[in-house]
Every structure is written in C-alpha cells, then in structure tokens.
Amino acid sequence: MIQVTYYREHCRVTVEGHAHSAEPGHDLVCAGVSALAYTLAANVGNLEDGGKVRFAYARLDPGNAEIGCTPKGKNAALVGCILNAVCVGFEMLARQYPEYISYEIHG
C-alpha cells in the first residue's frame, strides 16, 4: 500500500510504499501517484528557480519520495495553493482506490 502524507505547516509531502494493484509497468495507481509526485517536485523546483522559496528539496526514489520547500515572505499562499492542488489528486486516488493508497493531512 502507498501512504501519502501532507505536512501542511511544513510544506512537505511524503510518499512511501508500493500499490501492487497490477504487475510492474501496468500499475495505474502507482503511475498516478508517481505522476503527481513528479509534478509536485517540478513545481517546487520552479518556485525555487523563481525565487519564491528559500529552500526546496525533492527526493524521488522507487517506493519512497519526499518533496518540500520553505516559502519566502508573502509567497506562502502561492506555495500552499500549489501543494494543495497536487494533494487533491492524491486524495482523489485514495478515495477511488482505498485498498492501494492512503492519504493523510497533518497540520
């Protein structure tokens, strides 16, 4: 099972585990989670390149990802919007496939 956790106050998302909903290469739940994680990582990188965050990081390994950043000043709302938008996708997957993915929000 994949566990996605959104730490709202820390602008951080972790993704752990594997869905095992189909054979490797044919697992649509895994593909959906991976697409969202990579989208979030790219957006955090763009925020860093644009000077909107002080610090950004993304570690994307099979079955284990962590993505986060520290917003600069007035950019906290923008960063929150981006994180929330991607996390809606994780939440939708968890509702559709509760046997393969769980989603939690902290903070």
Q: Where do the PLM segments sit?
A:
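Short, conserved glycine- and acidic-residue-centered signature motifs
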Residues: 29-33
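N-terminal intrinsically disordered, cationic/polar leader segments
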Residues: 1-28, 38, 42-107
